[in-house]
Amino acid sequence: MNDGSNSDATATSSAAQRQVRVQLTSKQEDIALPDNTGPILVPTSLRRYALSTLVNKLLGNDKPIPFEFLINGTFLRTSIDEYLTANGISAETTLEIEYVRALIPPLHIASFQHDDWVSSTDVLSATSPAATWASATISQGQEKILSGSYDGLLRVWNMSSQIVATSPAAADGGHTASIKAAKFVTPNQIASAGLDRTVRLWKYAESDEGFSGTIAPQLELYGHKSGINSLAVHALSNRILSASSDNSVGFWSTKKSDAPAAPDDLLPSAASRSSKRRKLNSSVTVPQRGPLALLSSHTAPVSAAIFDAKDSTVGYSASWDHSMRTWDLVTSALVDTRTTSHSLLSLEHLPELNLLAAGTSARHITLIDPRASATTISAMTLRGHTNAVVSLARDPHSTYGLISGSHDGTCRIWDIRATKTDKDGAVGESVYSISRKSLEEQGRSDTKRVGGEGVKVFSVCWDKTVGIVSAGEDKRIQINRGEGVLSA
């Protein structure tokens, strides 16, 4: 007489042996299977590791590559069978599975200590925009890191954490207040801006051996009536965008000959006459110019202004007034306004996806489709930070990658394919969180502080050669690197 145990075993065996057809694809040519690779019948019990082994076998790799797998834009974190059950998908269908190189944790490489908070950072490397625009060759090991600090000084560092050059103090033509933004325009030119309301251009020169250099004042740009929060540069068109607390976006030329005269009432000489203060930069004469245009429409401080990554005649701005605005930089006309539910503090363009990422005061990142045809304001929300998101940079390795810097003391890496749907629509979660090394060195095991106290991140830059460079309240530049953190 059968006691039922055999039928139970048969059911278990049947579940284990259930199969599904999968079509394995990759968008990366160097790891893609041949076009004629058809659907493959695999057990639904397979998980990531077994699938990774299968793909390596199909590719004939001598040295296995760890892979991650995406189904309908979501990373596979269970068995295929569990995924099918959770999503109500029949095993009779052919499952499209995209594989990408597995994520590699971005390891700490170095930290550069400053005397004051570090507000901004940028990179000069063979793959950075400044070098690419200038068709310049930056040899391996000759990369430079630019930092702007609350002490009002710019510093250029080499990869051995040595200071190569420092900008002059206020009395010698430098900033007269804290710097909030700094960018390499070309390998020989730097732009900066800050609380002294000016945008400044500098000539950067290195000695032949590259161990020392100079940052010399080149041009002072006046037009804003309050502090400047961020800068964007586009060397090919010799243009700069600035975002100011006076509610306006500044549009400037990097060339003295193209720029109009500076407004008399905003020049230091006018301030000296009205307040009888000592003229701080009297020892140096630097050309002074005004803006090509001041774009006024925002009703609160502008936190960020950027160029469209594919069309430099288009600009975008984000503001404390909750809005993201699109500008025609040829005519200075406002083209479009997208209003969100929160103050916007940072902005980055993801051109291949037709999306703008905006960091908010509400601790999340909103992905906005700026195209006029878009029917919804927010295409996706990225959640995970515990304080304001004040800096964003796209992943140079991947169409889908983004990094954010937050006042919670962390940088988070996002793959916007890793999403789920809830009552608020599509929601993404970060794939990595980078803490401040300074906390580890203080012996704090949790490497976190409530609200990011003392370790707020103010700026983050992601360079294909150097890695992830972040700056913050801990008075440090921090470099982290993980080869191919995400996949294209």
UniProtKB/Swiss-Prot annotation:
ATP-binding as UniProt keyword: no
WD repeats: 128-167, 174-212, 223-262, 297-337, 339-378, 384-424, 452-488
Keywords: Nucleus, Repeat, Ribosome biogenesis, rRNA processing, WD repeat
One GO term of the biological process aspect: maturation of 5.8S rRNA from tricistronic rRNA transcript (SSU-rRNA, 5.8S rRNA, LSU-rRNA)
Stretch list, region Ubiquitin-like (UBL) domain: 20-101
Record keyword Zinc present: no
GO annotations of cellular component type: nucleoplasm; PeBoW complex; preribosome, large subunit precursor
Main location: nucleus
UniProt-recorded Gene Ontology molecular function terms: ribonucleoprotein complex binding
SUPFAM superfamilies, sorted: WD40 repeat-like (SSF50978)
Biased composition (Low complexity): 259-273
Pfam family, one: NLE
Domain of life according to the entry: Eukaryota
Disordered: annotated segments: 257-285
Subcellular location(s) per record: Nucleus, Nucleolus; Nucleus, Nucleoplasm
Similarity remark: Belongs to the WD repeat WDR12/YTM1 family.
Quaternary assembly: Component of the NOP7 complex, composed of erb1, nop7 and ytm1. The complex is held together by erb1, which interacts with nop7 via its N-terminal domain and with ytm1 via a high-affinity interaction between the seven-bladed beta-propeller domains of the 2 proteins. The NOP7 complex associates with the 66S pre-ribosome. Interacts (via UBL domain) with mdn1 (via VWFA/MIDAS domain).
Task of the protein: Component of the NOP7 complex, which is required for maturation of the 25S and 5.8S ribosomal RNAs and formation of the 60S ribosome.
Protein name: Ribosome biogenesis protein ytm1
Recorded name of the encoding gene: ytm1
